[in-house]
Amino acid sequence: MSIPRPKLALTLGDPAGIGPEIVLKALADPEVQSCAHITVVGDRQVLEATYRLLRDRSPAPLAHPAGIPMLECDTGFRLQPGCIGQGDADSGAVSFAYLRTAVERTLQGEFQGIVTAPIAKYLWHRAGHRFPGQTEVLAQLSRSEHYGMMFVARSPHSGWQMRVLLATTHIPLGQVPTVLTPERVRTALDLLVGSLRHTFGIPDPVIAVAGLNPHAGEQGQLGSEEKEWLTELLRTYAHAQIWGPLPPDTMWLAPAQAWHGQGSPAVADAYLALYHDQGLIPVKMLAFDRAVNLTTGLPFVRTSPDHGTAFDIAGQGVARCESLKQAILLAAELLGKNPS
């Protein structure tokens, strides 16, 4: 008995960035076409204008807008050539409208999951939407108190799947020691365990946790957080096998070996990084074109590519759609395992 293909909403992101381009490229891929019923959330004029601009420039195939199912947002926005690669408050406002519409329709049951193309946070702010990013909007609209950013990538070399959750997300580095409380780390671990068990089907997960300081504090000589509370919290955490706190610089050696298929390194089922760049530098070094942002703690599946709007190359036809493709495929895969 075949499993019905899931229904996904795919937002255009900021229309002045590469979002519309990578949407057209991803939807031209037969693997993407066959994995789910995909509806693009946005303005059809944006897709049509992007298609006209790129059809003679793009080395990769583009899906024709006429054949793409659309949920029209009717924002009144018109994509003009002068806006592409620049963006403004108007493009920020419509990208917010696309996301809000996708979430509302998903909560109403029209879709089972959402895949979001990139937005520009500073243009949201110009438009009056003071959110750190799309993740926080999703959480607020779905009334999700605890949520997290997990980055998932499957190696094309070995087939090993890397999973990295961030304990803190879009905050300045100087605020991390204050924001990173025992309660925050415990909540992140709970989110990670829940996702590994219920989303990925791993009943008894092993989780590696990075220290905050160089050498995981060196017994309090290079920082106090590990000695004062982090080590004890991890030792007494009862819902998974925990490795850590591990030195943040060497924790990523085994995942790198597993990614490249080198030897048989001891790898965890997932890795907890304590701040944004601690987790995303290794993820992007290993899997920039393949990593997917999976939001944990929501009542629906949400994925996105792990890159931004790339205004510097928008409108040139050279943007790669691989990360968006992987985001669509992962959402479809997870919904196939856990249909709702």
UniProtKB/Swiss-Prot annotation:
GO biological process: pyridoxal phosphate biosynthetic process; pyridoxine biosynthetic process
Additional free-text comment from the UniProt record: The active site is located at the dimer interface.
Organism classification: Bacteria, Bacillati, Cyanobacteriota, Cyanophyceae, Synechococcales
UniProt cofactor(s): a divalent metal cation
Protein name: 4-hydroxythreonine-4-phosphate dehydrogenase
Cellular component aspect of the GO annotation: cytoplasm
Reported function: Catalyzes the NAD(P)-dependent oxidation of 4-(phosphooxy)-L-threonine (HTP) into 2-amino-3-oxo-4-(phosphooxy)butyric acid which spontaneously decarboxylates to form 3-amino-2-oxopropyl phosphate (AHAP).
HAMAP family given in the database record: PdxA (MF_00536)
InterPro entries, sorted: PdxA, PdxA_fam
Catalytic activity: 4-(phosphooxy)-L-threonine + NAD(+) = 3-amino-2-oxopropyl phosphate + CO2 + NADH
Enzyme class at the top of the EC tree: oxidoreductase
Keyword entries, A-Z: Cytoplasm, Metal-binding, NAD, NADP, Oxidoreductase, Pyridoxine biosynthesis
Pathway: Cofactor biosynthesis; pyridoxine 5'-phosphate biosynthesis; pyridoxine 5'-phosphate from D-erythrose 4-phosphate: step 4/5
UniProt key word Transcription: no
E.C. number(s) listed in UniProt: 1.1.1.262
Binding partners and assembly: Homodimer.
Gene name of the encoded protein: pdxA
